[in-house]
Amino acid sequence: MRWHTEQVSEPILVIACGALAREITELKQSHGWDHMHLMCMDAWLHNEPELIADRLHRKITRHKKKYSRIFVAYADCGTGGAIDRVLEKEGVERLPGAHCYDFFAGAQRFAVLADAEPGTFYLTDFLARHFERFVIKPLRLDEQPHLRDHYFGNYRRLVFLSQTMNEELLAAARDAAKQLALDFEHVHCGYGGLESGLMAEVEKGTGG
């Protein structure tokens, strides 16, 4: 269903993790959120989460004079509450949850998955698409495959939390599980809390 925004004139700046760029762009197009301006930070920051909050703070400070409405498309993302401390100071809200797996799957479903098997490694569409760049190469598993058991010895399964029904990504996720010697499970989530979180922010500007 397309969300009509003809009555909305006030732009909203969404500062997002680069890992969500494709999904947010798709949601913007499908819902007609033409007043939503997207600015992405490097997805690689997830490998250095201690840098995320400061980078967010800089972007908010730089753009808050131009935009009266700013929303952050991050969860906590391993920052130990640092993002929330920045956002509380600036009066800005973010997506719900501790991480993207949480808001894609939904808190209740993710809790069930985590409780069923604590030793679970999760992939999203983005991570399935960029598995080599964000998992294999940073851990140097391409150079030293024997390190696999060191990093993943306590894991039992890989769960692919897909946003789209894409056979190529499904095959890539299966291959990732094989590379890590983990059982494979596919759970289709769609856009989950990413969509509902952005929708709620849009509705604030329409009086809905």
Q: Where are the regions that the model predicts?
A:
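Long, charge-dense
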Residues: 82-134
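C-terminal, charge/polar-rich interaction regions
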Residues: 162-208
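A conserved mid-domain beta-alpha-beta active-site/ligand-binding segment of alpha/beta enzyme cores
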Residues: 115-169
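A short beta-strand-loop structural module common to alpha/beta enzyme folds
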Residues: 34-52, 186-190
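N-terminal basic/disordered segments at the start of proteins
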Residues: 1-32
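Glycine-rich, highly charged phosphate/nucleotide-binding loops
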Residues: 49-62
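Gly/Ser/Thr-rich loops at beta-strand to alpha-helix junctions
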Residues: 15-22, 45-46, 73-83, 101-103, ...
